[in-house]
Amino acid sequence: MNMKTLLTYATLLSVTAFSHVVYADNQWPDLPTGFKDGVGAQVGSKVYVGLGSLGKSFYVLDLNALSKGWQKIADFTGAERSGATASVIGNYIYLFGGSGKAEPSDPSPILFDSVYRYDTKKDSWEKMNTTSPVGLLGASSYSPDNRQILFFGGYNKAYFDRYLRDISTTDKQVNPEVWQRIVDDYMGMTPTDYKWNRNVISYLPEKQEWRDLGVSTYLPNCGSATVIEGNKVTLISGEIKPGLRTAEVKQYEFGMDQPWKSLLPLPAPQTSNIQEGVAGAFSGKTNGVVVVAGGANFHGAKQAFENGKMFAHEGLPKAFNSEIYVEKEGIWSTVNSLPEGLAYGASFTTSEGVLIVGGEKSGKEMSHKVYMLAWNGSTVEVID
């Protein structure tokens, strides 16, 4: 990008409007290619993205050396995958879960239970001698103490592997009724029928040890936005079954006797009186407030579910949203919007704001754009 533009959007009343455009001193290099459904991790001043639409590729951007742009680093040594989760301990990035084909020739994808570690000093990958005890596709993770990694949510491996096998090995053209029945049976289950991971799971790399820290009082969900503050993590929205989101916001504080706390839910966007909830949203903190931006959902799914339809998103187009929400002192508000609807990219809290990278757009297009979101006290500046 030759010209970096600071786009400040006016607070919405009913439609989005640009307030003004000025030129920014900061320059946020765009990725060399589109990015979605991968992972992001932050080690010191460096942010990393990889997997998903990038295949086995990983890139790093040093926030203290922006002129170098995104640099390609060592390729991932495992199978390509989407929907994985990654967390950092020291100079290591640990990678878990995701879904893909173990071998390119395999008839169907699987949900991976393998664990990999990237050494940021040596620029090298290694496979750890362990497997996760629960499915971690779509799970959220963080390290509360720089020693262990905690996990929330995640698809059930046995159930999802069977669904992927059945749908991948059934010819839709030859057996359309059989194919549709497989979809209807899976998508028509209640949220609890999917048996997503409801426990808080801990992984201690130095001992290769997994522990169960207890059952969550909430429905398990996947694709949540996360905001990490020390030993606390805030889990924002996400899906409670395929196609159905929740507006719920909750916080987990590691080490407490009562670690869970309910927070106020996401408010409805200014264009609707219903908050469907979002999955794959961008999130972080800037100038003392929590920001949640973008995310995907199916408009109308919540009402269909409340009317008793379990396949709640049947026939509904997937919506990629542009709304930005701000939480200040426990209260949510809707403010301005992203330049376009985006979901399933990566986001990082930095000293200058929330850096968002890539994402899927409407029409299944992928974005290579990088923006900085900065709260100025009344609106979120979107710095290109």
From Swiss-Prot:
Coiled-coil annotation: which residues? Answer: none
Entry's Gene Ontology cellular component terms: periplasmic space
Q: Where would one find the signal peptide in this protein?
A: 1-24
Keyword line: Carbohydrate metabolism, Isomerase, Kelch repeat, Periplasm, Repeat, Signal
Where is this chain's protein located in or outside the cell? Periplasm
Q: Which reaction does it catalyse?
A: N-acetyl-alpha-neuraminate = N-acetyl-beta-neuraminate
Recorded family membership: Belongs to the NanM family.
Protein name stated in the entry:
N-acetylneuraminate epimerase
Q: Which organism is it from?
A: Vibrio cholerae serotype O1 (strain ATCC 39315 / El Tor Inaba N16961)
Which lineage is the organism of this entry classified under, starting from the top rank?
Answer: Bacteria, Pseudomonadati, Pseudomonadota, Gammaproteobacteria, Vibrionales
